[in-house]
């Protein structure tokens, strides 16, 4: 429960218009009921149900901090811990940069990447991770479905950097990420996001059709 400050007196802060957190609740079941309440943050105090009594976990929480920032150990408040970890696994891909200066167009340090970065900069590592521990067949099928005869290779360069090599029918050499069209690059980014070896409970893709050729949309949907 968020709301603006109710104090009629002037607040000596430049952040006086920030919303304040008044109430946070974690409960069991599909609907809130007082009897199903497990963790309750009311104003500055956080309490958790312990059998038939309530344990106070914190008493002086700033009104701009969530209970997830203040408590949440597996031992003292497992409900907060589990809910926080559940939310942390959500993925939001608002915008993949594909301009000439975008990091995804340059070789990047290659480390195991089961989750694509929100801006896609670690695309090469994410694709290689799918090849090694994910559904490599689905990835190859998604690429050939959109680009018949095409194939992908991740090149290991000096210094541990990974680079994308995209082979297409009719071309004598592979294309680097810097040479790919915006649509092709965005398609590969979406494939890497959707075929993650660690699928989240919630994934949000903002306007995934942006910059994609209409012919690629059926392949993306499949």
Set out the residue ranges of the language-model regions.
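Electropositive, glycine-dotted interaction segments
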Residues: 1-137, 141
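ABC-family P-loop ATPase nucleotide-binding domains
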Residues: 133-157
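Switch/communication elements of ASCE P-loop NTPase nucleotide-binding domains
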Residues: 149-152, 156-222
């Amino acid at each position: 429960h968020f709301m603006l400050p109710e104090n009629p007196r002037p607040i000596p802060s430049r952040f006086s218009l920030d919303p304040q957190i008044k109430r946070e609740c974690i409960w069991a079941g599909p609907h809130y009921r007082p009897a199903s309440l497990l963790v309750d943050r009311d104003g500055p105090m956080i309490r958790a149900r312990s059998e038939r009594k309530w344990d106070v976990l914190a008493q002086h929480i700033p009104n701009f901090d969530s209970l997830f920032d203040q408590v949440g150990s597996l031992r003292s408040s497992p409900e907060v811990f589990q809910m926080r970890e559940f939310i942390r696994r959500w993925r939001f891909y608002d915008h993949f940069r594909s301009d000439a200066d975008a990091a995804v167009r340059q070789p990047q340090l290659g480390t195991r990447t089961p989750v694509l970065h929100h801006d896609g900069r670690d695309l090469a590592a994410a694709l290689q991770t799918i090849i090694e521990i994910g559904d490599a067949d689905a990835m190859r099928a998604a690429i050939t479905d959109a680009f018949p005869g095409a194939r992908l290779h991740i090149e290991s360069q000096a210094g541990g950097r990974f680079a994308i090599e995209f082979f297409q029918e009719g071309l004598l050499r592979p294309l680097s990420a810097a040479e790919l069209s915006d649509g092709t690059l965005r398609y590969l980014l979406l494939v890497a996001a959707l075929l993650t070896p660690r699928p989240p409970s919630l994934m949000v893709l903002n306007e995934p059709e942006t910059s994609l050729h209409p012919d690629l949309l059926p392949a993306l949907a499949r």
